[in-house]
Every structure is written in C-alpha cells, then in structure tokens.
Amino acid sequence: MSGDRLEFENPIEDAVSRLRFSPQSNNLLVASWDSYLRLYDVESSSLSLELNSQAALLDCCFENESTSFTSGSDGFIRRYDLNAGTVDTIGRHDDISTSIVYSYEKGEVISTGFDEKIKFWDTRQRESLVFSTDAGGAVGCVTVSGNNLVVCVDASMHIYDLRNLDEAFQSYASQVEVPIRCITSVPYSRGYAVGSVDGRVAVDFPNTSCSSEIKYSFRCHPKSRNGRLDGVCINAIEFSPCGSGTFVTGDNEGYVISWNAKSRRRLNELPRYSNSIASLAFDHTGELLAIASSHTYQDAKEKEEAPQVFIHRL
C-alpha cells in the first residue's frame, strides 16, 4: 500500500462512499455508510469534525470551507455547518439519493436519485427546491463543469446546460457500452471521462471541434483469468486539477493507476491496496491524492474489513 494512512479516534465502521477535498484547502470530507460525515485536516493530521446523519451517506460535496452537503440512503439532502457542527435537512428525493454536486456558476446544490429525478436546491431561498426534472432513469453518477451538467443513466450520458434546463441539449450512449460507474470532468477542456463496471475508460469531448482528442476508450484494468481478459469494475476516476492531462483510476481489486489523457499513456501504478478503491480525490493543487480503501457493496467477493483512507503525495 502507498501513502500515509489517516488516523481516526473512532474508526470508520462501514464502507466509505466519497472523498472530497475542499476547493481552497486541504480539508477532506469523508462520507460513509456508517451515517457519519467526517472532516479531516490533512495538514495537521487531525479529525476536525464528525457528524451523525441518521442514514448511510452515499455522496458529499463542499459549497465552501464552512458548508457542505450530503445525499443519503433515506433520500434526504442534508446541509452541514462545519464551523458550528450542526446538521439540517433541505429536502429529499422519493427514493435513495445517489449523487450530489455543487454548481458555483448557479450557486445551487444539484442532487440525483433512484427516483429518476434531478433536483436543484438554492439554500438562499425560503423554499430551497427551485427546480426538478426527469432524468429518464435511475441516475448512477453526475459531474458538473462550468455551465454543463452531465448525468449518467446506465450506459448513457445526458448533458444539460445549467442556463436552460428544459431538457438535455445532448444525449448519447457512452463508448463503454455497459453501465457507467463513475465520471469526472476534464479540467482543461469541455470534456468528461467515465469508468465502467467492466474496467473500461472512455474520454469524451462532445462539444469540441478538435481533431485528435475528440473521443477514445480503452480497457484500463484488465485481469487475466482462465486464458482470457476479464474487466474489473472501476469505482473511481479523477483528473488532476493542474491541467497536465493526468487522471487516476481505482478499481474493485485495490489498484490505483495514473494515466495521461493527452498522450493516452499509462504513467504509474501504486502498490495494491488491501481492499477495493471506493473513492479518489485530488486536492486543489494536485499535489495530494486521497485514496479510500474500502468495500463498496458492488461485489460479493469484497472483504468487509475496516475501511482506510490514505494520502499519497505526488
């Protein structure tokens, strides 16, 4: 295993679902199935906050240094005052809420769920829910980049313009052709990268006229079994914010691999972790990579040992 392991006074008791670094510091959010949202100060190697949420947390995001949000298995969208250590509910989905992101362009929280809804929340308003639209299916993952929101339903990608939400302005089947497990925005371009349940990565630039970097896909985590290549589910994919074109993938067998999207080359593979890679997150400088080694409830063969979070310095 590679990196410094974070120490928690009260161990994380169930699967880690999401890691998120703050946009401007090395504060790290850790959302997990044990109902706790944890805030960890990586610089001082100390736990700053631990808040119970009464439901398994499936995703989290920052608004700023003092405010964050989560989506839960009970459908509720919760807001956390990280300075006061308080939690309140801003609304809910009619089924499990799977994903949550914050749009800095709109100043709104965007959540999705198994109720096939995309919901937009503005906590500055008395009625926080400002818009809701049908996703056309249960949403697996989302990402937001500028004014573009990308919603993944099964193997399809639906792109919305946040300035005009009447309908998706572009919908197409991803190159991976199987259910999409994770998605990330490409920092240096209006594009996206997705990881699939069968170990494929697809990099798409749907709104560019560039010649050579439009779109491509490859099998990123092949494993040889019985004389043939089997794919291993990619649970996490993240681009470095430094604009180098580097991105990392994490799979269900504990491997973290870095790649260069521009040269289409494999760069490095970290020593194998003891459990699945559940989530990855870069800090705002691209110098730190947070890695969650944890079961994910995606594979019956996973080991349900205590989850661990590591910081790898690049």
UniProtKB/Swiss-Prot annotation:
Disulfide bond residue pairs: none
Coiled coil: none
WD repeats (start-end): 11-50, 52-90, 92-131, 134-173, 176-215, 229-269, 272-311
One cellular component term from this protein's GO annotations in UniProt: kinetochore
Swiss-Prot/TrEMBL GO biological process terms: cell division; chromosome segregation; meiotic cell cycle
Subcellular location: Nucleus; Chromosome, Centromere, Kinetochore; Cytoplasm, Cytoskeleton, Phragmoplast; Cytoplasm, Cytoskeleton, Spindle
Alphabetical list of Gene3D superfamilies matching this protein: YVTN repeat-like/Quinoprotein amine dehydrogenase
Keywords associated with the record: Cell cycle, Cell division, Centromere, Chromosome, Chromosome partition, Cytoplasm, Cytoskeleton, Kinetochore, Meiosis, Mitosis, Nucleus, Repeat, WD repeat
Subunit structure, interactors included: Part of the mitotic checkpoint complex (MCC).
PANTHER family: MRNA EXPORT FACTOR AND BUB3 (PTHR10971)
Functional note: Has a dual function in spindle-assembly checkpoint signaling and in promoting the establishment of correct kinetochore-microtubule (K-MT) attachments. Promotes the formation of stable end-on bipolar attachments. Necessary for kinetochore localization of BUB1. The BUB1/BUB3 complex plays a role in the inhibition of anaphase-promoting complex or cyclosome (APC/C) when spindle-assembly checkpoint is activated and inhibits the ubiquitin ligase activity of APC/C by phosphorylating its activator CDC20.
Record family assignment: Belongs to the WD repeat BUB3 family.
UniProt name for this protein: Mitotic checkpoint protein BUB3.3
